[in-house]
């Protein structure tokens, strides 16, 4: 029987963080690094828990080099060859602790990932990424990967509800990717009518994961540093960004010049562009669930990184969190009808 859940679900745009008394004198006092010990792999990781999405325009080796200099993480896209990985491991061994090998849930994906992890044993993270993490097939795939790689930390998703977070953690995943349809180049919600407002999804999924000593990634929906702060405030352990890291020198693709403006291509991994590039086209039984856009060229990603980290430190000082770990404990969200003054855009 159809039913309606009448409880209000909110997105980042529906709330602001309430400022609170603070003993911090400066943003420079805020510690953004976190240390995690993962439930199933038993591995420990330290770093700033912001992840570049495993999309083939942004999840590049070039991006990983810059991110690792800030102790930030990159989920490298799944379309690099074994030789590409070997070359990267030889030239940038210092980056390998801050990257994940990405994989779909097919047999070919598993074989390819296995070859890479065998050739580059320093990589300890696996990102299992499918659009719909609710399928029985995916749960079984997570169990299989856990049995093959007992000491690797597994990220798996995407889902948006507590019961599926619990299922995937109990099946062997350590970190669950949360988000269905919030991405800047995702059209799942308009094509399928399926989705969940990201802020509420993060709050509910974090509660379920933390009860089992698991972790979550808020994946998608961030448009500015304030949204990243809200995701952490809602209980996300990691925040994954795609659109905010698009358009940079380190992104894949050439710079396009049009009408005197420099642009770079950015597209969703279920878009026509991605499926034509990697699967020879959109299969008859599928619909494209992603956009292809030309974004303004932003130069080196370094400035964007500093902007995001600076915003996050400032959030922590406003709410009295000396460490990023404390942000969710200090966060009180207020519902609003407007985010900011739009007189000048």
From Swiss-Prot:
Has the keyword Ribosomal protein been applied to this entry? no
Active site per the UniProt annotation: 186, 188
An example Gene Ontology cellular component term from the record? GMP reductase complex
Q: Where along this sequence does the record place binding of K(+)?
A: 181, 183, 186, 189
Q: How does it assemble?
A: Homotetramer.
Looking up NCBIfam families in the UniProt record yields: GMP_reduct_1 (TIGR01305), PRK05096.1 (NF003470)
Tell me which stretches of the chain form a coiled coil.
Answer: none
Q: What is the protein name given in its UniProt record?
A: GMP reductase 1
Q: Name one GO molecular function term.
A: GMP reductase activity
Top EC category:
oxidoreductase
Database matches in Pfam families: IMPDH (PF00478)
* Protein task: Catalyzes the irreversible NADPH-dependent deamination of GMP to IMP. It functions in the conversion of nucleobase, nucleoside and nucleotide derivatives of G to A nucleotides, and in maintaining the intracellular balance of A and G nucleotides.
**Gene name tied to this protein:** Gmpr
Q: Which UniProt keywords apply?
A: Metal-binding, NADP, Oxidoreductase, Phosphoprotein, Potassium, Purine metabolism
- GO biological process assignments: IMP salvage; purine nucleobase metabolic process
Reaction catalysed? IMP + NH4(+) + NADP(+) = GMP + NADPH + 2 H(+)
Q: Which SMART domains match?
A: IMPDH
* Record-listed E.C. numbers: 1.7.1.7
Q: Which HAMAP family match?
A: GMP_reduct_type1
InterPro entries on file = Aldolase_TIM (IPR013785), GMP_reductase (IPR050139), GMPR (IPR005993), IMP_DH/GMP_Rdtase_CS (IPR015875), IMP_DH_GMPRt (IPR001093)
Q: Does the keyword Disulfide bond apply?
A: no
């Amino acid at each position: 029987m159809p039913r309606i859940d009448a409880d209000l679900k909110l997105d980042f745009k529906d709330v602001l963080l309430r400022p609170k008394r603070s003993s911090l004198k400066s943003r420079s006092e805020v510690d953004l690094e976190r240390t995690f010990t993962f439930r199933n792999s038993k591995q420990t990781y330290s770093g700033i828990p912001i992840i570049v999405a495993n999309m083939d325009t942004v999840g590049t080796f070039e991006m990983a080099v810059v991110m690792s200099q800030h102790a930030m993480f990159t989920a490298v896209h799944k379309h690099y060859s074994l030789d590409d990985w070997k070359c990267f491991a030889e030239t940038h061994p210092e980056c390998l602790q801050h990257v994940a090998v990405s994989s779909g849930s097919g047999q070919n994906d598993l074989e390819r990932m296995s070859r890479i992890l065998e050739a580059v044993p320093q990589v300890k993270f696996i990102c299992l990424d499918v659009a719909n993490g609710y399928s029985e097939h995916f749960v079984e795939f997570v169990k299989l990967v856990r049995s093959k790689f007992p000491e690797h930390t597994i990220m798996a998703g995407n889902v948006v509800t507590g019961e599926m977070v619990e299922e995937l953690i109990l099946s062997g995943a350590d970190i669950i990717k949360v988000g269905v349809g919030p991405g800047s180049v995702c059209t799942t919600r308009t094509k399928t009518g399926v989705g969940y407002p990201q802020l509420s999804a993060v709050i509910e999924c974090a509660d379920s994961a933390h009860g089992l000593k698991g972790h979550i990634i808020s994946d998608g929906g961030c448009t500015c540093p304030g949204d990243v702060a809200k995701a952490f405030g809602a209980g996300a352990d990691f925040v994954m960004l795609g659109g905010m890291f698009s358009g940079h020198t380190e992104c894949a693709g050439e710079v396009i010049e049009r009408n005197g403006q420099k642009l770079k291509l950015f597209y969703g991994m279920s878009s026509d562009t991605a499926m034509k590039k990697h699967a020879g086209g959109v299969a008859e039984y599928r619909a494209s669930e992603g956009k292809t856009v030309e974004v303004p060229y932003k130069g080196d990603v370094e400035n964007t990184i500093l902007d995001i980290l600076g915003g996050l430190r400032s959030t922590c000082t406003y709410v009295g969190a000396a460490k990023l770990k404390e942000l969710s404990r200090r966060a009180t969200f207020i519902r609003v009808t407007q985010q900011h003054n739009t007189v000048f855009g």
